[in-house]
Amino acid sequence: MANTNLKEAKAAKNDEFYTQFHDIEIEMNAYLEYDPDVFRGKTVLLPCDDPEWSNFTRYFAAKFDELGLKKLISTSYAPDAKKMKLLAEPSLFEKEAPQFDPQKAQTKGKIFVLEKDHTGDGHINIDDLEWEYLEGDGDFKSKEVTQLRNEADIIIHYCPKKLPHRFS
């Protein structure tokens, strides 16, 4: 079954294989050892990073208070934009949201923002993550997503190997 999924991803030229949480933590710790305040008061942008699948948003959400982040923004591609043969099933997180729209869930990208304690538990974490649909499909080259970089102090971006280019 897993091999079938990999073959389908290869056929669809989907080379977005996700980084493990532990590996992200090791890399970020290197930055923190060099400068413990490297993220303090900063807005971090993670373009084309779906927190329902990727660990980068999960890492920064889990460490939001500890890192002293001001704001976390991540965007994700629309399933239709990925051109995969596999049917993308919206997550429970998405389906239970009042703004859920089955049509938009397939054709529109999403923006996820974390900056406030919405749950009232005194901490800002993944439970406080808010999202909405983008106007477009979430392509990191789109005007909509590139405008977000003007708000960001730090951009962490994994560009699929098939799409290397300048993020400008």
Task: Briefly describe each language-model feature range.
Residues 138, 152-153:
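Helical hinge/lid and interdomain linker segments adjacent to catalytic or ligand-binding clefts
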Residues 162-168:
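A short, conserved alpha-helix within the catalytic core of class I
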Residues 1-121, 127:
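S-adenosyl-L-methionine
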Residues 155-162:
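Amphipathic alpha-helical repeat scaffolds
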Residues 119-147:
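Alpha-helix-centered segments that form part of catalytic cores
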Residues 38, 148-150:
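A short, aliphatic-rich alpha-helical micro-motif
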Residues 27-33, 141, 145, 157:
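Structured alpha-helical segments in the cores of large, soluble enzyme domains
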